[in-house]
Swiss-Prot record:
Function, in words: Controls the reversible conversion of biologically active glucocorticoids such as cortisone to cortisol, and 11-dehydrocorticosterone to corticosterone in the presence of NADP(H). Participates in the corticosteroid receptor-mediated anti-inflammatory response, as well as metabolic and homeostatic processes. Plays a role in the secretion of aqueous humor in the eye, maintaining a normotensive, intraocular environment. Bidirectional in vitro, predominantly functions as a reductase in vivo, thereby increasing the concentration of active glucocorticoids.
Protein name: 11-beta-hydroxysteroid dehydrogenase 1
Segments on the Cytoplasmic side according to the record's topology features: 1-7
Lineage of the species this protein comes from: Eukaryota, Metazoa, Chordata, Craniata, Vertebrata
UniProt cross-references to PANTHER family, sorted A to Z: 11-BETA-HYDROXYSTEROID DEHYDROGENASE 1 (PTHR44279:SF1), HYDROXYSTEROID (11-BETA) DEHYDROGENASE 1-LIKE B-RELATED (PTHR44279)
Positions annotated with a glycan in the UniProt record: 95, 207
Pfam families in the cross-refs: adh_short (PF00106)
Tissue specificity field: Liver, kidney, lung, hypothalamus, anterior pituitary and placenta.
Gene: HSD11B1
Length: 292
């Protein structure tokens, strides 16, 4: 009976509340109207489509990528689509100093920050891993470390607005995928870092949500070229994928699954993990870290 009161009943209450509110909360485009949003990796593909969706919703959009010419076109199109404002800052996320300075610059451009969408990646060709440590290091730096730098730099602004961090990841960060060892390692690391960070935020009363987006194969030009003749699967549309990512961030969901197969979300969603996180957290004295 004591075990039920201490563990089972709180767990049941958490899950019932979670599913009730998740089922009854609907996304509305006006949730993003006037919001200040950063999108990285926004010169093409999913990032560009997210910028366009946000523009249609009336958000203030700041985009970044390496190609200045491409970013100029994205900003121009965002303004045509109805963005409250649109700005770009070109640079590479291989440079951690740039990553940190970019967040500060973006905050100056739009007067703060409500949502940070981390979408950029280091491209890695599909091939058998053969002691390419340079490739692995670069993947970890761009796909993980720069995400940490960006989110850390953005946190003071996001605390002020009870904002959101949206992390674009992959099925390759949930299951073993051949020919993508370096990429997969960086995506598994994203899950580990940001899922742990979410738990810390919740326990220390930091009202900033973290949404991890688990994507399957999406029909971007880069992805289609990478898998041609190697991987046989139907790709999902990037436009719809981009919208689902934004919805998940706006609704402050823990995870978003987007793939052409319903099996992806059914098999990868793990309620047991949430239970274990809850039980584990009970063993920590988190009160000493609140407001520190």
């Amino acid at each position: 009976m004591a075990f039920m009161k201490k563990y089972l009943l709180p767990i049941l209450g958490i899950f019932l509340a979670y599913y009730y509110y998740s089922a009854n909360e609907e996304f509305r485009p006006e949730m993003l109207r006037g919001k200040r949003v950063i999108v990285t990796g926004a010169s093409k593909g999913i990032g560009r489509e997210m910028a366009y969706h946000l523009a249609r919703m009336g958000a203030h959009v700041v985009v970044t990528a390496r190609s200045e010419e491409s970013l100029k076109k994205v900003v121009s199109r965002c303004l045509e689509l109805g963005a409250a404002s649109a700005h770009y800052v070109a640079g590479t996320m291989e440079n951690m100093t740039f990553a940190e300075q970019f967040v500060a610059k973006a905050g100056e451009l739009v007067g703060g920050l409500d949502m940070l969408i981390l979408n950029h990646i280091n491209y890695t060709p599909l091939r058998v891993f053969s002691n390419d440590i340079h490739l692995l290091r670069r993947s970890l730096e761009v796909n993980l470390l720069s995400y940490v730098v960006l989110s850390t730099a953005a946190l003071p602004m996001l605390k002020q607005t009870s904002g959101s961090i949206v992390v674009v990841s992959s099925v390759a960060g949930k299951i073993a995928c051949p020919l993508a060892a370096a990429y997969s390692a960086s995506k598994f690391a994203l899950d580990g870092f940001f899922s742990s960070l979410r738990t810390e935020y919740e326990a220390t009363k930091v009202n900033v949500s973290i949404t991890l987006c688990i994507l399957g194969l999406i029909d971007t030009d880069t992805a289609m070229k990478a898998v041609a003749g190697i991987y046989n699967a139907e790709a999902s549309p990037k436009e719809e994928c981009a919208l689902e990512i934004i919805k998940g961030g706006a609704l402050r969901q823990d995870e978003v699954y987007y793939d052409n197969s319903i099996l992806t979300s059914l098999l990868l969603k793990n309620p047991g993990r949430k239970i274990m996180e809850f039980l584990s957290l009970k063993k920590y004295n988190m009160e000493r870290f609140i407001n520190n």
